[in-house]
């Protein structure tokens, strides 16, 4: 059956199911319900939707259109949430930027993404200006969160004036909405393209397998530039009509106080932050009795910490979320009743995901054997922006090949045993060992270096460098660390530096990092260990 173009367009608009549409529907269902809390600001869903619409219309009036890329450099704030949904309603691709990166690292993302505009929080305006200059970007929209500055508009003007009508832009299911830069395993980050199809399928998996509901009151303290906090939790809360309490960061005292004051029921933290909460003196004095749901990810929860959490927060159910940015990001879930019986496991595939382990030839491996973790799902990204070669390799055969190695038992429970290409996950952040190695190689006197992660009681994994000096070089730990800090974001710098006469290698000359991990894996517990 065929219809006139006008009728077909009207039907398509009626059926549109994009991320931006989710907010409009939630605001229609729960107009007076508390949507977002950030400091003294409190928005109902009707108010939040109006702020999003005004922002979208303001961006459109400034020439920002569907398909354009808008970079966002900011800590968590309610404005971040507004921009995430305003860009989604316009079909503009949001490019969240890690605020811990330096100007050169940000400049690469700006240039590679093709960003035509940028919004920066006041604390990062100077960094943003350096990055924009280095990237050669002189035009486009520049918005500042936190007031006006020379060359920057105060973004408060965007959501306080102008029409609050929905912009009514036709956004298709597979139009890109997010360009998330992941460290991957390379010296340069890759831009992962996520669409409404990817994100909403992932939201459904989070809701069903993660036990989420409209009654949740969630504290968001992990960086929203990560798709975990932004799209496993904040956007899902908006989808459901739950309440989001936004903190600028995971300060333990502030987190505990906020759980008490807002009667929060739900919290996501990587294990490092859960450990910080447990060790904080306020943990036993704050009223945390409202908390019912706890989530962790980014790395495995140490079993002793898991037991302590269950002992000290007996009414809190725990979920382990495992995945990758390319999966928007959820792939597998370990549910509350499985936490101790399957301790250390990443759980089973989420409802909208198929997960298998494959060998080097792409063939499935039997239960109990190590293989590369691969997923097939509508969660999956559209690919890597402007990188056909890496996209073809990672998505070969219709499966996303994660680069992680794992073992699956006969019941389908996955355990992650290694990262195929030496990714380090420290404090919830991804660090590519190659990038750190390349930075250290720039230091005079370095003959060889190998960077890897070792177990750490706080960071879960600590970046560790074994350095082989050149003959007669007078290298010191302080010199290596000072050099690293000049070239890398702080979280990428080594926590431990070890000097050696040689690196272990196989007959073909490949450095045996597994041997190095075994040799230096107890550095965190040694007396006198050198740490940054």
Residue ranges of each PLM-predicted region?
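Conserved AMP-binding A3 loop
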Residues: 44-46, 177-201
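A short helix-loop-beta submotif of the ANL/AMP-binding
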Residues: 56, 68-69, 75-103, 111-117, ...
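Conserved pre-ATP/AMP-binding loop-to-beta segment of ANL
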Residues: 16, 31-32, 150, 162-181, ...
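Structural core segment of the AMP-binding/adenylate-forming
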Residues: 24, 57, 61-62, 89-159, ...
């Amino acid at each position: 059956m065929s219809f006139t173009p006008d009728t077909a367009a009207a039907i398509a608009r009626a059926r549109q199911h994009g991320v931006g549409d989710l907010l409009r529907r939630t605001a229609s269902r729960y107009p007076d319900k508390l949507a977002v809390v950030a400091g003294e600001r409190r928005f109902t869903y009707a108010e939040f939707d109006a702020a999003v619409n005004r922002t979208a219309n303001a961006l459109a009036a400034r020439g920002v259109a569907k398909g354009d890329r808008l970079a966002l450099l900011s800590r968590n704030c309610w404005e971040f949430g507004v921009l995430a949904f305003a860009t989604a309603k316009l079909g503009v691709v949001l490019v969240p930027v890690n605020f811990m990166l330096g100007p050169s690292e940000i400049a690469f993302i700006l240039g590679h993404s093709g960003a035509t505009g940028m919004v920066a929080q006041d604390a990062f305006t100077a960094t943003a200006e350096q990055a924009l200059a280095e990237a050669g970007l002189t035009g486009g929209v520049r918005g500042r969160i936190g007031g006006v500055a020379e060359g920057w508009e105060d973004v408060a003007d965007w959501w306080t004036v102008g029409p609050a009508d929905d912009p009514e832009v036709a956004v298709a299911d597979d139009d890109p909405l997010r360009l998330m830069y992941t460290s991957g395993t390379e010296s340069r980050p890759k831009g992962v393209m996520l669409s409404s199809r990817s994100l909403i399928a992932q939201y459904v998996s989070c809701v069903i397998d993660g036990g989420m509901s409209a009654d949740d009151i969630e504290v968001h303290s992990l960086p929203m530039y990560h798709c975990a906090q932004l799209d496993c939790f904040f956007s899902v809360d908006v989808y459901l009509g739950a309440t989001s309490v936004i903190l600028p960061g995971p300060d333990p005292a502030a987190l505990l106080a906020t759980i008490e004051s807002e009667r929060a029921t739900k919290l996501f933290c990587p294990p490092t932050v859960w450990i910080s909460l447990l060790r904080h003196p306020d943990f036993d004095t704050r009223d945390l009795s409202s908390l019912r749901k706890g989530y962790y990810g980014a790395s495995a929860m140490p079993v002793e910490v898991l037991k302590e959490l269950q002992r000290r927060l007996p009414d809190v159910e725990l979920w382990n979320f495992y995945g990758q940015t390319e999966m928007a990001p959820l792939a597998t879930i370990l549910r509350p009743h499985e936490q101790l019986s399957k301790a250390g496991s990443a759980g089973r595939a989420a409802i909208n995901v198929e997960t298998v382990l494959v060998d080097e030839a792409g063939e499935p491996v039997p239960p109990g054997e190590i293989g590369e973790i691969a997923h097939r799902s509508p969660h999956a990204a559209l690919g890597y922006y402007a990188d056909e070669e890496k996209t073809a390799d990672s998505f070969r055969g219709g499966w996303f090949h994660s680069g992680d190695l794992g073992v699956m038992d006969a019941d389908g429970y996955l355990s992650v045993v290694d990262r195929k290409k030496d990714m380090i996950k420290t404090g919830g952040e991804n660090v590519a060992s190659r990038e750190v190695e390349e930075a250290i190689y720039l230091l005079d006197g370095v003959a060889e270096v190998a960077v890897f992660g070792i177990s750490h009681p706080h960071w879960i994994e600590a970046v560790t460098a074994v350095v082989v000096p050149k003959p007669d070089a007078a290298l010191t730990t302080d010199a290596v660390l000072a050099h690293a800090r000049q070239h890398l974001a702080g979280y990428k710098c080594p926590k431990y530096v070890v000097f050696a006469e040689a690196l272990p290698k196989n007959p073909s000359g490949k450095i045996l990092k597994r041997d190095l991990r075994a040799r230096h894996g107890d550095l965190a517990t040694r007396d006198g260990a050198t740490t940054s």
